[in-house]
UniProtKB/Swiss-Prot annotation:
Subunit structure, as described in the record: Monomer.
Disulfide bonds: 3-18, 10-23, 17-30
Name recorded for this polypeptide: Kappa-theraphotoxin-Tb1a
Superkingdom in the source lineage: Eukaryota
Record text about domains: The presence of a 'disulfide through disulfide knot' structurally defines this protein as a knottin.
A cellular component term, taken from the record's GO annotations: extracellular region
Record lineage: Eukaryota, Metazoa, Ecdysozoa, Arthropoda, Chelicerata
GO MF annotations in UniProt: ion channel inhibitor activity; potassium channel regulator activity; toxin activity
Alphabetical keyword list: Disulfide bond, Ion channel impairing toxin, Knottin, Neurotoxin, Potassium channel impairing toxin, Secreted, Toxin, Voltage-gated potassium channel impairing toxin
Tissue: Expressed by the venom gland.
Organism: Theraphosa blondi
Amino acid sequence: AACLGMFESCDPNNDKCCPNRECNRKHKWCKYKLW
């Protein structure tokens, strides 16, 4: 399966976001990992 891009909805407990992105627990979408 393809990874999730920016602002795609995601599950924080099963993070499928693309590399250098993380699932935001508050908004439930993928965002850039700043650190």
